[in-house]
Each structure stands twice: as structure tokens, then as C-alpha cells.
From Swiss-Prot:
Keyword Transferase in annotation: no
Gene responsible for this protein: smpB
KW Cytoplasm (keyword) present: yes
Localization per record: Cytoplasm
Superkingdom of the organism of origin: Bacteria
Species assigned in the record: Xanthobacter autotrophicus (strain ATCC BAA-1158 / Py2)
Single Gene Ontology BP annotation: trans-translation
Comp. bias intervals (Basic and acidic residues): 136-158
Gene Ontology CC terms, in alphabetical order: cytosol
Biological role stated in the UniProt entry: Required for rescue of stalled ribosomes mediated by trans-translation. Binds to transfer-messenger RNA (tmRNA), required for stable association of tmRNA with ribosomes. tmRNA and SmpB together mimic tRNA shape, replacing the anticodon stem-loop with SmpB. tmRNA is encoded by the ssrA gene; the 2 termini fold to resemble tRNA(Ala) and it encodes a 'tag peptide', a short internal open reading frame. During trans-translation Ala-aminoacylated tmRNA acts like a tRNA, entering the A-site of stalled ribosomes, displacing the stalled mRNA.
Gene3D superfamilies attached to this UniProt entry: 2.40.280.10
Keywords: Cytoplasm, RNA-binding
The protein, known as: SsrA-binding protein
Membrane spanning residue stretches: none
Amino acid sequence: MSSKKTEAPRKIAADNRRARFDFEIGETFEAGVMLTGTEVKSLRTGKATIGESYAAQKAGEMWLYNAYIPEYLEANRFNHETRRPRKLLLHKRQIAKLGHAVEREGMTVVALKIYFNDQGRAKVELALAKGKKAHDKREASKERDWARDKARLMRDRG
């Protein structure tokens, strides 16, 4: 008998739920992150914030900016900077594709979540995104409210 492996849920360290409201999400990418030991330990506590973080190309490499990973309490003087730029590990073609979309099409590379994969490595889910206007946000909010009201009406009648 062969045993089936059940896929373990990914341990999400940080989630950018606001990005799906503020941006129209396009293609997504998975990237590795270069972290120090205290950053990894701090990420495992689940207190990181990526609400305002974005990725940008610099000298042919992708960097993650403005991601907040709090100091690890047990590290005392060997701690890391909380908002330092972190290098992202992507293939050259992916970096070129992201750079082209940012320069030519006016898109932004947004971090959607940071998680640990099956091997315990920290990964960032990036997305090519285009900013929404205020009226688009209001329209999305109205649609969401209507869907909720419709579900409530169907539940009460049925």
C-alpha cells in the first residue's frame, strides 16, 4: 500500500490583506528572501508586518523594502534592523519581467504574504499590481456588501 502525503498548511508569518483592496492583483511570483538568523526566529513568532512593503529592482537585483520584522527578544545586542532592505531571490527572467512591468506599464510589485514552505524556508509571495482609484474601491466595497446581503436574504428565505 502506498501512503498519500497530505499537504501540510503553510505557516504564514505575515499577510498583506490590504493589498487586495488597494490594488488590482495581476500575476503572482514566489521569491526566496535573504534573512539573518534573528529575522527568521522573529518571523516564526508571527509578528511581522508587510502592509506597506513593496519590491523594487536595484542593480539587476530585486529588493524588498519597508517590511517590518520586529527584533527578536532573546538576541540582545546581536539583533537586526527592523526595516532594512532585504534581497529577494528570483531568476533573472523573473527579475527582468518584473522590472519591465514596473517601468513600462506603471505597475507596482507588492508583497502579499511571507510564509515558510515545507522545507522551513522563508518565502515571499509577490504580485504585479496596479493601483485602484478611490471610486474603484467604493465600487468593490458596494459589491461585497451586496453579496453579503444577498446571501443573508437567501439564507433567511431558504
